[in-house]
Amino acid sequence: MNYDVVIARYGEIGLKSSKVRARFERKLVKNIKAAIDCEVDRNQGRIYIFPKNYGECLENLNKVFGVVSYSPAVSTYGNYEDIEKTLGEYVDNLVDDGFIGKDTRFAIKCRRVGNHDFTSQEMAAFCGSVVVKKVGCPVDLTNPELKIYVEVRDDEAFIYHEKIDGPGGLPLGTQGKVVVLVSSGIDSPVAAYLMMKRGCEVIALHCDNAPFTGPKVHENFDKIIDQLQSYAKGVPITKKVVKYGEYLQQAKDCAPEKMTCVLCKSGMYKIAEKLAHKYGASAIVDGSSVGQVASQTLSNILATRHGVDMPILSPLIGLDKLEITRIAEDIGTFEISKLDDGGCHAVPKYPETKADVDRVEEACRAMNQKEAIEKAFDSID
């Protein structure tokens, strides 16, 4: 098929006010151009992409947030004669590619924008007759095996038969910055992805727990960020690493051992908050899911967030491990996250699962947490 345009559609952007909608459209176009070598036109709720490489376009458009669906199409003039000629050629290609034959039930879906001397129904009936004459296949408006779409917009027409799902969401970079705590595990990369899908620019903060973790953890983190960068065209992820091993050692030496994981998470939040203030981010994000591990009981979630004034968002909070894993598989981070990296050896045998604010504050004082956080923060690279 000799496509000459790809039609991209957005969803909730269209529900915004005209001013916000225009701003979001401009950002979406900018991100599309960052992902694809192309020219782009905007017109009445559609984005028309003219790529130099159609294979690259179809592959990368699936990773541009804000795009709900897209269709490779052929264009022509919006009159009966040109539509008949172009549709006939289009159907010939569908026959050659095995999409339609004399027994294929089909339907024409026509949409029209602008002033014309025909209605959408009249154009649909006309296009249907073109297909029947070409192939001899039956029309079935109720349960068609193939839908052929004809969009007539002012003096142009577009013909296509596929609607490919995009990632949806909002254009990346329209909702401000967030600091995401990203490990080499399964959950936090998914949390970062979901915040990107909601339009947030991501600053990924990784806590390097060496010597309690091995070099594989850091290597896998780098691979995960590289994979997530494929969804961040136009607004790349900023990667930051804090040396966190000394903080953990101080927590283990000065506070009850069972509080290690609680103090670890508390320190992460406070370092992330300082980083957020430095880079103008508005929230902290983590991969917490209620009850999944010891540090994610409701008691611990409350206690570890004490002393942090910035919003802490947990997009996975109500998802189970299977749901999170499915998303990780879809976005390409699961195969990296499941690699054996040795884990963290600072985890106590019996971690605290019912922490309260008073005991956490006492443990923070015992380890001189404020000083330890300042020292760790200065190590961020």
Swiss-Prot record:
Enzyme Commission number(s) from the entry: 2.8.1.4
Top-rank taxon, per record: Archaea
Which UniProt key words apply to this protein? Answer: ATP-binding, Cytoplasm, Nucleotide-binding, RNA-binding, Thiamine biosynthesis, Transferase, tRNA-binding
Give, as one word, the top-level EC class.
transferase
Q: Which InterPro entries match?
A: Rossmann-like_a/b/a_fold (IPR014729), ThiI_AANH (IPR020536), ThiI_fer (IPR054173), ThiI_N (IPR049961), THUMP_dom (IPR004114), THUMP_ThiI (IPR049962), tRNA_STrfase (IPR003720), tRNA_sulfurtransferase_ThiI (IPR050102)
**Localization in the cell:** Cytoplasm
**Which reaction is the catalytic activity of this chain?**
[ThiI sulfur-carrier protein]-S-sulfanyl-L-cysteine + a uridine in tRNA + 2 reduced [2Fe-2S]-[ferredoxin] + ATP + H(+) = [ThiI sulfur-carrier protein]-L-cysteine + a 4-thiouridine in tRNA + 2 oxidized [2Fe-2S]-[ferredoxin] + AMP + diphosphate; [ThiS sulfur-carrier protein]-C-terminal Gly-Gly-AMP + S-sulfanyl-L-cysteinyl-[cysteine desulfurase] + AH2 = [ThiS sulfur-carrier protein]-C-terminal-Gly-aminoethanethioate + L-cysteinyl-[cysteine desulfurase] + A + AMP + 2 H(+)
Family label: Belongs to the ThiI family.
Biological role: Catalyzes the ATP-dependent transfer of a sulfur to tRNA to produce 4-thiouridine in position 8 of tRNAs, which functions as a near-UV photosensor. Also catalyzes the transfer of sulfur to the sulfur carrier protein ThiS, forming ThiS-thiocarboxylate. This is a step in the synthesis of thiazole, in the thiamine biosynthesis pathway. The sulfur is donated as persulfide by IscS.
Name the NCBIfam families on file: tRNA uracil 4-sulfurtransferase ThiI
Name-wise, this protein is: Probable tRNA sulfurtransferase
State the organism named in the record.
Answer: Methanobrevibacter smithii (strain ATCC 35061 / DSM 861 / OCM 144 / PS)
> Which gene does this sequence derive from?
thiI
